[in-house]
Amino acid sequence: MARYRRRSRSRSRSRYGRRRRRSRSRRRRSRRRRRRRGRRGRGYHRRSPHRRRRRRRR
C-alpha cells in the first residue's frame, strides 16, 4: 500500500503542479514584463498626457 500511495501522489503532483505552474508562470511573466517595460520606460510618460489632451480637444 505504501508504494502505491507514493506513486499516485508523485504522479498527481507532477501532472497538475508542473503544468499549472509552467502555464501560469509563462503567461504571467510574458505579460508582466511587456507591461512593466512600457509603463516604466519611454512610452508610458509620453503617451498618458498626449491621450488625455487629444480626448479633451476632440
Swiss-Prot record:
The tissues in which it is expressed are: Testis.
Q: Among its keywords, does the record have Nucleus?
A: yes
Please report any disulfide bonds recorded for this protein chain, giving both cysteine positions: none
The listed locations are: Nucleus; Chromosome
Molecular function in Gene Ontology: DNA binding
Q: Name one GO cellular component term.
A: nucleus
Q: Where is this region: Disordered?
A: 1-58
Superkingdom of this protein's organism: Eukaryota
- Principal place of residence: nucleus
| Family assignment from sequence similarity | Belongs to the protamine P1 family.
Q: What is this protein called?
A: Sperm protamine P1
Q: Which gene encodes it?
A: PRM1
